[in-house]
Amino acid sequence: MSSALLSARDLVAAGTALLQRALATLDDAALAEPTALAGWTRAHVVAHVAANAEALVNLTTWARTGVETPMYASPEQRESDIEKGALLAPARLRDWFSTSAAGLDDALGLLDGESWTRLVRTAQGRTVPATEVPWMRTREVMVHAVDLDGGVGFDDLPTDFLLEVLHDAAAKRSRGADGPAVVLVSTDPTDTLDGTPRSTAWPVVGLGDAVTVRGPLPQLAAYVTGRRATGLTAETGTLPVLPHWL
Protein backbone atom coordinates (compact mmCIF):
# COMPACT_ATOMS: atom_id res chain seq x y z
CA MET A 1 0.00 0.00 0.00
CA SER A 2 1.33 3.44 -0.92
CA SER A 3 2.28 6.00 1.72
CA ALA A 4 -0.58 8.20 0.49
CA LEU A 5 -3.12 5.44 1.14
CA LEU A 6 -1.61 4.71 4.54
CA SER A 7 -1.94 8.40 5.40
CA ALA A 8 -5.54 8.42 4.14
CA ARG A 9 -6.41 5.45 6.34
CA ASP A 10 -4.70 7.13 9.29
CA LEU A 11 -7.08 10.08 8.84
CA VAL A 12 -10.03 7.67 8.82
CA ALA A 13 -8.80 6.20 12.10
CA ALA A 14 -8.27 9.66 13.61
CA GLY A 15 -11.77 10.76 12.63
CA THR A 16 -13.31 7.56 13.96
CA ALA A 17 -11.53 8.10 17.27
CA LEU A 18 -12.79 11.69 17.48
CA LEU A 19 -16.37 10.64 16.82
CA GLN A 20 -16.04 7.84 19.36
CA ARG A 21 -14.71 10.38 21.86
CA ALA A 22 -17.67 12.68 21.28
CA LEU A 23 -20.12 9.79 21.52
CA ALA A 24 -18.59 8.61 24.80
CA THR A 25 -19.32 11.97 26.43
CA LEU A 26 -23.05 11.64 25.71
CA ASP A 27 -25.39 9.69 27.94
CA ASP A 28 -28.21 7.69 26.41
CA ALA A 29 -30.80 10.42 26.95
CA ALA A 30 -28.62 12.90 25.06
CA LEU A 31 -28.81 10.77 21.92
CA ALA A 32 -32.47 11.73 21.54
CA GLU A 33 -31.69 15.46 21.60
CA PRO A 34 -31.79 17.49 18.37
CA THR A 35 -28.70 18.61 16.48
CA ALA A 36 -28.13 21.58 14.21
CA LEU A 37 -28.90 19.29 11.25
CA ALA A 38 -32.54 19.80 10.34
CA GLY A 39 -34.76 16.96 11.56
CA TRP A 40 -31.90 14.91 12.98
CA THR A 41 -31.23 13.96 16.57
CA ARG A 42 -27.82 12.80 17.71
CA ALA A 43 -29.10 9.26 17.21
CA HIS A 44 -29.79 10.07 13.55
CA VAL A 45 -26.19 11.28 13.16
CA VAL A 46 -24.77 8.10 14.69
CA ALA A 47 -27.08 5.91 12.60
CA HIS A 48 -26.09 7.78 9.45
CA VAL A 49 -22.38 7.32 10.14
CA ALA A 50 -22.86 3.61 10.89
CA ALA A 51 -24.91 3.07 7.73
CA ASN A 52 -22.30 5.02 5.76
CA ALA A 53 -19.59 2.59 6.87
CA GLU A 54 -21.64 -0.33 5.60
CA ALA A 55 -22.34 1.50 2.33
CA LEU A 56 -18.63 2.12 1.82
CA VAL A 57 -17.96 -1.58 2.43
CA ASN A 58 -20.17 -2.11 -0.63
CA LEU A 59 -17.80 0.09 -2.65
CA THR A 60 -14.78 -1.87 -1.43
CA THR A 61 -16.55 -5.07 -2.52
CA TRP A 62 -17.11 -3.50 -5.95
CA ALA A 63 -13.45 -2.51 -6.13
CA ARG A 64 -12.20 -5.91 -4.98
CA THR A 65 -14.46 -8.12 -7.10
CA GLY A 66 -15.31 -5.93 -10.07
CA VAL A 67 -19.01 -6.67 -9.48
CA GLU A 68 -21.08 -3.49 -9.32
CA THR A 69 -22.20 -3.06 -5.71
CA PRO A 70 -23.83 0.35 -5.11
CA MET A 71 -23.56 2.10 -1.78
CA TYR A 72 -27.33 2.04 -1.33
CA ALA A 73 -30.11 0.20 -3.15
CA SER A 74 -31.95 3.53 -3.42
CA PRO A 75 -32.14 6.95 -1.76
CA GLU A 76 -35.25 5.70 0.01
CA GLN A 77 -33.34 2.75 1.47
CA ARG A 78 -30.65 5.10 2.72
CA GLU A 79 -33.19 7.29 4.50
CA SER A 80 -35.05 4.28 5.90
CA ASP A 81 -31.85 2.80 7.35
CA ILE A 82 -31.09 6.07 9.13
CA GLU A 83 -34.61 6.42 10.53
CA LYS A 84 -34.68 2.81 11.74
CA GLY A 85 -31.20 3.12 13.19
CA ALA A 86 -32.13 6.25 15.12
CA LEU A 87 -34.82 4.22 16.90
CA LEU A 88 -32.43 1.52 18.10
CA ALA A 89 -31.76 1.13 21.79
CA PRO A 90 -28.75 3.33 22.65
CA ALA A 91 -26.50 0.36 23.43
CA ARG A 92 -27.30 -1.25 20.07
CA LEU A 93 -26.76 2.03 18.25
CA ARG A 94 -23.36 2.54 19.88
CA ASP A 95 -22.43 -1.04 19.02
CA TRP A 96 -23.54 -0.56 15.41
CA PHE A 97 -21.25 2.43 15.08
CA SER A 98 -18.27 0.51 16.48
CA THR A 99 -18.80 -2.71 14.54
CA SER A 100 -19.53 -0.97 11.24
CA ALA A 101 -16.40 1.17 11.56
CA ALA A 102 -14.31 -1.93 12.29
CA GLY A 103 -15.92 -3.74 9.35
CA LEU A 104 -14.98 -0.94 6.98
CA ASP A 105 -11.41 -0.92 8.26
CA ASP A 106 -11.19 -4.66 7.61
CA ALA A 107 -12.67 -4.22 4.12
CA LEU A 108 -10.18 -1.50 3.22
CA GLY A 109 -7.38 -3.80 4.34
CA LEU A 110 -8.44 -6.39 1.74
CA LEU A 111 -7.87 -4.07 -1.22
CA ASP A 112 -4.74 -4.55 -3.31
CA GLY A 113 -3.05 -2.32 -5.88
CA GLU A 114 -5.41 -3.19 -8.73
CA SER A 115 -8.49 -2.93 -6.52
CA TRP A 116 -7.60 0.57 -5.39
CA THR A 117 -7.61 1.82 -8.99
CA ARG A 118 -10.98 0.29 -9.92
CA LEU A 119 -13.75 2.82 -10.57
CA VAL A 120 -16.80 2.89 -8.29
CA ARG A 121 -19.79 5.21 -8.03
CA THR A 122 -20.65 7.44 -5.08
CA ALA A 123 -24.17 7.96 -3.75
CA GLN A 124 -24.17 11.33 -5.54
CA GLY A 125 -23.48 9.57 -8.86
CA ARG A 126 -19.82 10.52 -9.30
CA THR A 127 -17.46 7.90 -10.73
CA VAL A 128 -14.23 7.80 -8.71
CA PRO A 129 -11.35 5.38 -8.11
CA ALA A 130 -11.55 3.32 -4.94
CA THR A 131 -8.68 5.40 -3.57
CA GLU A 132 -11.37 8.02 -2.84
CA VAL A 133 -13.17 5.76 -0.36
CA PRO A 134 -10.93 6.58 2.65
CA TRP A 135 -11.46 10.29 2.03
CA MET A 136 -15.22 9.80 1.75
CA ARG A 137 -15.18 8.13 5.16
CA THR A 138 -12.82 10.69 6.70
CA ARG A 139 -15.14 13.50 5.68
CA GLU A 140 -18.09 11.75 7.31
CA VAL A 141 -16.51 10.91 10.66
CA MET A 142 -14.66 14.20 11.10
CA VAL A 143 -17.56 16.54 10.34
CA HIS A 144 -20.18 14.44 12.12
CA ALA A 145 -17.95 14.21 15.20
CA VAL A 146 -18.53 17.96 15.44
CA ASP A 147 -22.25 17.62 14.68
CA LEU A 148 -22.71 15.43 17.76
CA ASP A 149 -21.88 18.48 19.92
CA GLY A 150 -20.08 16.26 22.39
CA GLY A 151 -16.99 18.35 23.01
CA VAL A 152 -15.35 18.00 19.58
CA GLY A 153 -15.15 21.14 17.45
CA PHE A 154 -13.54 22.09 14.18
CA ASP A 155 -10.57 23.34 16.21
CA ASP A 156 -9.95 19.70 17.20
CA LEU A 157 -9.74 18.43 13.62
CA PRO A 158 -6.30 17.82 12.04
CA THR A 159 -4.90 20.61 9.89
CA ASP A 160 -4.42 18.25 6.94
CA PHE A 161 -8.11 17.38 7.09
CA LEU A 162 -9.18 21.03 7.31
CA LEU A 163 -7.11 21.88 4.25
CA GLU A 164 -8.48 18.96 2.28
CA VAL A 165 -12.11 19.56 3.21
CA LEU A 166 -11.79 23.22 2.24
CA HIS A 167 -10.47 22.17 -1.17
CA ASP A 168 -13.09 19.44 -1.52
CA ALA A 169 -16.10 21.49 -0.43
CA ALA A 170 -15.04 24.54 -2.46
CA ALA A 171 -14.67 22.34 -5.55
CA LYS A 172 -18.07 20.72 -5.03
CA ARG A 173 -19.77 24.06 -4.53
CA SER A 174 -18.03 25.39 -7.63
CA ARG A 175 -19.33 22.47 -9.71
CA GLY A 176 -22.87 23.29 -8.66
CA ALA A 177 -22.31 27.06 -8.86
CA ASP A 178 -25.79 27.56 -7.38
CA GLY A 179 -24.76 29.66 -4.40
CA PRO A 180 -22.95 32.95 -3.87
CA ALA A 181 -19.42 33.32 -5.21
CA VAL A 182 -16.90 33.60 -2.37
CA VAL A 183 -13.17 33.43 -1.83
CA LEU A 184 -12.17 31.82 1.46
CA VAL A 185 -8.92 33.21 2.86
CA SER A 186 -7.20 31.71 5.89
CA THR A 187 -5.63 33.99 8.46
CA ASP A 188 -3.75 31.04 10.01
CA PRO A 189 -0.44 29.42 9.07
CA THR A 190 -1.41 26.41 6.96
CA ASP A 191 1.79 24.38 6.63
CA THR A 192 1.22 20.65 7.00
CA LEU A 193 3.08 18.57 9.55
CA ASP A 194 5.92 17.90 7.11
CA GLY A 195 6.36 21.61 6.49
CA THR A 196 4.99 21.59 2.94
CA PRO A 197 3.29 24.93 2.15
CA ARG A 198 -0.36 24.61 1.22
CA SER A 199 -3.02 26.90 -0.15
CA THR A 200 -4.33 29.76 1.95
CA ALA A 201 -7.19 30.76 -0.37
CA TRP A 202 -10.05 28.73 -1.81
CA PRO A 203 -12.32 30.28 -4.47
CA VAL A 204 -15.91 29.10 -4.76
CA VAL A 205 -17.46 29.71 -8.17
CA GLY A 206 -21.01 30.95 -7.88
CA LEU A 207 -23.49 33.72 -8.48
CA GLY A 208 -22.58 37.40 -8.43
CA ASP A 209 -19.31 39.10 -7.56
CA ALA A 210 -17.09 37.03 -5.30
CA VAL A 211 -17.06 38.10 -1.65
CA THR A 212 -13.82 37.51 0.27
CA VAL A 213 -14.36 35.76 3.59
CA ARG A 214 -11.42 35.68 6.02
CA GLY A 215 -10.83 33.83 9.24
CA PRO A 216 -9.16 30.95 11.05
CA LEU A 217 -8.81 27.70 9.13
CA PRO A 218 -11.16 25.66 11.36
CA GLN A 219 -13.92 28.25 11.07
CA LEU A 220 -13.56 28.50 7.30
CA ALA A 221 -13.97 24.72 7.17
CA ALA A 222 -17.08 24.97 9.34
CA TYR A 223 -18.53 27.68 7.10
CA VAL A 224 -17.88 25.94 3.77
CA THR A 225 -19.41 22.69 5.07
CA GLY A 226 -22.55 24.50 6.16
CA ARG A 227 -21.87 24.47 9.90
CA ARG A 228 -22.01 27.34 12.39
CA ALA A 229 -18.84 29.40 12.19
CA THR A 230 -17.47 32.21 14.34
CA GLY A 231 -14.65 34.69 13.91
CA LEU A 232 -15.14 35.17 10.16
CA THR A 233 -15.26 38.52 8.40
CA ALA A 234 -16.69 39.30 4.98
CA GLU A 235 -15.60 42.31 2.98
CA THR A 236 -19.27 43.22 2.49
CA GLY A 237 -19.89 43.08 6.24
CA THR A 238 -22.35 40.17 6.01
CA LEU A 239 -21.40 36.54 5.49
CA PRO A 240 -23.00 35.13 2.32
CA VAL A 241 -25.40 32.29 3.07
CA LEU A 242 -24.21 29.10 1.40
CA PRO A 243 -26.65 26.42 0.20
CA HIS A 244 -26.68 22.81 1.41
CA TRP A 245 -23.29 21.10 1.06
CA LEU A 246 -23.85 17.31 0.78
Please give the residue ranges for each predicted region:
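Short, helix-capping/interhelical loops that line the mouth of catalytic, cofactor-
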Residues: M1-S7, A55-G103
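Structured surface interface patches that mediate subunit assembly and partner/cofactor docking
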Residues: S2-A8, T61-E68, L110-L246
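Conserved catalytic core of Hanks-type protein kinase domains
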Residues: T25, H48, Y223
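Structural signal for well-ordered, non-membrane alpha-helices
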Residues: T16, Q20, A24, A53-V57, ...
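Alpha-helical scaffold segments that form or flank carboxylate-/histidine-based iron centers
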Residues: S2-L11, A30-N52, S80-L93, V120-R139, ...
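Short, conserved sequence motifs enriched in acidic/basic residues, glycine, and aromatics
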Residues: T25, A36-G39, L110
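Short, Lys/Arg-rich amphipathic segments at extreme N-termini
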Residues: R9, A13-L31
